[in-house]
Every structure is written in structure tokens, then in C-alpha cells.
Regions:
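Sec-dependent signal peptide recognition
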Residues: 2-9
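Hydrophobic h-region of N-terminal signal peptides that target proteins for export
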Residues: 10-18
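Boundary/entry segment of secreted carbohydrate-active catalytic domains
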Residues: 20-55
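Hydrophobic faces of well-ordered beta-strands that scaffold small-molecule active sites
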Residues: 25-29, 64-66, 105-109, 158-162, ...
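Acidic-and-aromatic substrate-binding clefts and catalytic sites of carbohydrate-active enzymes
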Residues: 35-36, 40-47, 71-75, 81-89, ...
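Glycoside hydrolase catalytic-domain groove-lining segments
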Residues: 46, 50-53, 186, 197, ...
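Substrate-binding cleft and catalytic face of glycoside hydrolase catalytic domains
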Residues: 57-207, 211-213
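Aromatic-rich peripheral "rim/lid" segments of glycoside hydrolase catalytic domains that contact
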Residues: 259-266, 279-312, 316-364
Length: 364
């Protein structure tokens, strides 16, 4: 215990001496080019047309998250209708635009042909039939080749996610695991080590993020990152998703953040995904309103949630990033997606920026 206390004290001194790490504010805008191609107009709070990236910059954003799928052409039609289209060419073009606009880049690699999340982490079609070592080799080769392609185009991400919401593993069924136990972590960590090795080789200055989504479950979160520590996984930042409809209350999130700071003081934490509803119109997830008793499903409820979340995060010095997921949703007069999620930061009917955008910008 004394050795651990001394280590934490020395680490704190080092942080003071070197200055606090930079804080990132931004969003995952991976569908923005598709909306723009459909003729979608984005507007500021007063209804005046805007260029989205310039507006985000004006609102204090300094980073953008871009997702990358392996071969989205193999995605089921239902997922294509949800906006799955981000192959390497798409991600590269958007990333170049992001960097040219002066933002730092978080590249979010989904090791799947479509959505990778707690309920699905399916192996890319072209990797099916591989054994666990062949899958690890594929992770390494794909990560390395993708980063090399981006680097040749002059794009080096400041941050790279090796996997997306991989609480339950990745590359199912081979890499599936129970995050509350120990089984499966050896295979998962071999996959992670392969991806991280490629990141270190091609983009040695990039920060590596390992992203899970059980922000409201401390026991699972603790066990998960302890298992990674035991296996010497090489990463820099703990990434969490936090959605109020799935992950508990904001005070509960605060306890998780405090505990992470105590147990993993060397690892900054980022909320790499958050969002909240302002409506349920045309929403395929409309049943996800079990949190309405805390935050009404309304513009005011979304604003209240954002204000309270930012207030909580600003209390935690170990939290160095906050990203809104799908802020660019703007569905009026287009069919970019089949339904509306109504969790973005622009009104689906008017294209106007929502008040939650102002509250979001208070993360400091």
C-alpha cells in the first residue's frame, strides 16, 4: 500500500510539473458528408446557414471523431440505412477535411463491416473462418495498412481507438467474452496488442484509446481494465460511453470516474460517446425512454442533461475529453437514414443548432 501511495504521489507531481493534459471537446460527425451530399442545410441558433466545421470551431470544439469500418459494402441493408458507409476512402477524405480545418483527429476503428457495439462485434466477412492467431494477424495488417494510407495522405490522428465499445470483446465469436470474469481476455488482449503494435509503429505519437461502455457499472469497468493491466495491454487512455438511457445516473458516473482515478491514476479518461434525446419522432429506439423521469424527452430535457453532465465532468481532473455521438443528425427533407434518433445537436425539422450545444461547450 505504501509503494502504491508513493507511486500515485510521484505521478501527481509529474503531472503538475508537466502541466495538465490538453482537454478535448468534439463530436463524432462521421455522417456529415452524406448529409451535405443530400443538400442538407445546417443553421446556427438564429437560423442562419453555417458551415458545420467552422461553427463547431466557434463553439469551442478542438477535436473530431471519425469512424472506420473494414468493408461496409458487406453490411446488411438495415445497417446501410442507418448510415454505415465509412470505408477507408470515406474516412480518409473526412479526416483530411477535419485536419485542414484545424481540428485534432480521433480515428475510431471498428474491426467489423458495420456497427461494433455491446450487442454485436461481428468479424469482417473477409476474415471469417480465421483462427485466433490469423485474426490477430489480420488486425495488425489492417490497422497498419489503414494508418499507412492515411499517413501517406498527410493525415496522422492524434488519437486512435483500437475497437469500439469492446466491453464484450471483439471479432465474435472467437473474441467474445464475459467482462465480469476472466475467460476470453487472453484472446482479446492478443487482438488489442496486435492493433496497438501497428499504431505504435506507424503513428508513434498518437494516443491509443481502449473504449468500453459500462460507465455505470464500476465492478465490470474495474475488472475489465484490471484484466488489461495484468496482460500488459499497451494503451494510453480509457475511453467510455455514457448514455443516460443505458448507463445510470450522472452521480453514478462520477463515482466510476473517481474510482478510475484512484485505481488507474496513470490513465486519463475520455467520454468518447454521449448523447441524449430531445424527441422520439420517427425514432426506431423510441422505447428507450426509461430515463424520462430524470430528463424529459424534449429540447429542455436534452439541455438539462448536457448541463448536468458537463458540470460533473468538470469536477474530475482525470477526464480529458468529451465527444457527442452523431451531433450532425439533421434529417428533414432527406433520406440519409431511414429513421431519426433525435439525439443530435441540430433540430431535425429546422436544421437549427439546439440549446444543448451551448451547454456542451462549457466542458473545460
Amino acid at each position: 500500500m505504501r509503494k502504491k501511495g508513493l507511486f500515485c504521489f510521484l505521478l501527481m507531481l509529474a503531472m503538475v510539473a508537466n502541466g495538465q493534459p490538453r482537454k478535448y471537446l468534439g463530436g463524432d460527425i462521421s455522417l456529415l458528408p452524406s448529409y451535405e451530399q443530400a443538400g442538407t442545410v445546417y443553421r446556427d441558433f438564429d437560423g442562419k446557414p453555417i458551415e458545420p466545421l467552422a461553427f463547431f470551431k466557434k463553439m469551442g470544439w478542438n477535436a473530431i471523431r471519425v469512424r472506420l469500418f473494414v468493408n461496409p459494402e458487406f453490411a446488411p441493408q438495415e445497417h446501410k440505412e442507418e448510415g454505415v458507409c465509412q470505408d477507408l476512402k470515406y474516412a480518409l477524405n473526412l479526416s483530411k477535411r477535419v485536419k485542414d480545418a484545424g481540428f485534432d483527429l480521433l480515428l475510431d476503428i471498428h474491426y467489423s463491416d458495420y456497427w461494433a457495439d455491446p450487442g454485436k462485434q461481428f468479424t469482417p466477412k473477409r476474415w471469417e473462418g480465421c483462427n485466433k492467431q490469423q485474426l490477430a494477424d489480420s488486425v495488425y495488417a489492417y490497422t497498419r495498412a489503414s494508418l499507412q494510407t492515411m499517413k501517406r495522405a498527410g493525415i496522422v490522428p492524434e488519437m486512435i481507438q483500437v475497437g469500439n465499445e469492446i466491453t464484450n470483446g471483439m471479432l465474435w465469436p472467437t473474441g467474445k467474452l464475459d467482462p465480469s470474469g476472466r475467460e476470453g481476455f487472453d484472446i482479446l488482449c492478443n487482438f488489442l496488442k496486435a492493433g496497438c503494435k501497428a499504431c505504435r509503429e506507424i503513428c508513434p505519437k498518437s494516443q491509443i484509446i481502449i473504449h468500453t461502455e459500462k460507465a455505470g457499472d464500476w465492478d465490470v469497468t474495474r475488472n475489465y481494465y484490471q484484466q488489461l493491466r495484468y496482460r500488459q495491454a499497451d494503451y494510453d487512455i480509457i475511453g467510455l460511453s455514457y448514455y443516460p438511457m443505458w448507463h445510470g445516473t450522472i452521480p453514478n458516473l462520477g463515482r466510476t470516474l473517481d474510482n478510475l482515478n484512484w485505481l488507474f491514476p496513470e490513465k486519463p479518461v475520455m467520454i468518447v460517446e454521449t448523447a441524449a434525446y430531445y424527441s422520439h419522432e420517427r425514432d426506431p429506439w423510441a422505447k428507450g425512454d426509461q430515463y424520462a423521469e430524470f430528463y424529459p424527452i424534449s429540447v429542455e430535457g436534452q439541455t438539462q442533461f448536457t448541463r448536468e453532465l458537463v458540470t460533473e465532468l468538470n469536477k474530475h481532473h482525470n477526464v480529458t475529453g468529451l465527444f457527442w455521438w452523431f451531433p450532425e443528425e439533421n434529417g428533414f427533407n432527406n433520406e440519409v437514414t431511414k429513421g431519426w434518433l433525435n439525439r443530435g445537436l441540430f433540430d431535425n425539422h429546422t436544421g437549427k443548432a439546439l440549446p444543448a450545444m451551448r451547454e456542451f461547450s462549457q466542458f473545460k
